[in-house]
Structure formats: structure tokens, C-alpha cells
From Swiss-Prot:
This protein's encoding gene: ZNF593
Annotated source species: Homo sapiens (Human)
Transmembrane annotation, as ranges: none
Record keyword Nuclease present: no
Record-given protein name: Zinc finger protein 593
Gene Ontology annotations for the cellular component aspect, listed alphabetically: cytoplasm; nucleolus; nucleoplasm
Zn finger region (C2H2-type): 61-85
Cited function: Involved in pre-60S ribosomal particles maturation by promoting the nuclear export of the 60S ribosome. Negatively modulates the DNA binding activity of Oct-2 and therefore its transcriptional regulatory activity.
Gene Ontology terms: biological process: negative regulation of RNA polymerase II regulatory region sequence-specific DNA binding; positive regulation of transcription by RNA polymerase II; ribosome biogenesis
Residue ranges with Basic and acidic residues bias: 26-36
Family: Belongs to the ZNF593/BUD20 C2H2-type zinc-finger protein family.
Subcellular localization, as worded in the UniProt entry: Nucleus, Nucleolus; Cytoplasm
Comp. bias regions, Basic residues: 1-25
Record text about domains: The protein is largely disordered, with the exception of the zinc finger domain.
Subunit structure: Associates with pre-60S ribosomal particles.
Length: 134
């Protein structure tokens, strides 16, 4: 038995890091900012939404809570019943970490437990389908 060469093994770590960065999704505080009712950046369902060929389903069916795009409304509704979506809604129900909470943790105040926020179960930017039954 001879000695085997392991060429190219040192590149696997950097490739894994690149793929991890590519699949990175927005953090919870960024999603909270989008879901805020008074936030001007909150996307609303737009019947005249522009079709984006780079996104699944043209970017028309999106779950805001999970920051994912879906091919059609059927897959989006199936996603609403999935374990991943329910887990993300549970994470979003806790108030995001703030500077005041960081100061209290450092001993500059008394502990106040984080508030529970009401998150709608079906958060999406789904565009209503056109009715062609005439």
C-alpha cells in the first residue's frame, strides 16, 4: 500500500464558506423591521409587480417571515403549514434585542423580560391571481 495523495482537500473549507454566505438569509431584526406596520419599507402585495426572472416564481410569491420565494401560491400555502415556518414565527414573536436590553444585561438597570409580539401567521407578499372565469 502506497501513500495516497490528498490533493484539493484544503479548498473545501473556503468553498463551504462561500456557499454558506450565498445561502445566508436576513436576520430576525431585519425581518422585524420589514414586518413593522408603520415601516415604510414593508412590501405590500402589488398586482402590477414586476416579474423577476432570477427569483423562483418570478419573485411574486414570498414569505416575509422566512424571507423565501416560492414558485406558486400552492407551494406558499403548503409552506405556511410547515414546521420551519412555524418555528420562524415563534422566533419572531419575541421582541428583538435592543440597546436598552444590552445595557440592562451589563448591570445598568433591572431585568425586564422581553415582550411577546403578535406576528400574523400567514405573512406573504402573494399577488392575487387574476380571475379569468367570464
Amino acid at each position: 500500500m502506497g501513500r495516497s495523495r490528498r490533493t484539493g482537500a484544503h479548498r473545501a473549507h473556503s468553498l463551504a464558506r462561500q456557499m454558506k454566505a450565498k445561502r445566508r438569509r436576513p436576520d430576525l431584526d431585519e425581518i422585524h423591521r420589514e414586518l413593522r406596520p408603520q415601516g415604510s419599507a414593508r412590501p405590500q402585495p402589488d398586482p402590477n409587480a414586476e416579474f423577476d426572472p432570477d427569483l423562483p416564481g418570478g419573485g411574486l410569491h414570498r414569505c416575509l417571515a422566512c424571507a423565501r420565494y416560492f414558485i406558486d401560491s400552492t407551494n406558499l400555502k403548503t409552506h405556511f403549514r410547515s414546521k420551519d415556518h412555524k418555528k420562524r414565527l415563534k422566533q419572531l414573536s419575541v421582541e428583538p434585542y435592543s440597546q436598552e436590553e444590552a445595557e440592562r444585561a451589563a448591570g445598568m438597570g433591572s431585568y425586564v423580560p422581553p415582550r411577546r409580539l403578535a406576528v400574523p401567521t400567514e405573512v406573504s407578499t402573494e399577488v392575487p391571481e387574476m380571475d379569468t372565469s367570464t
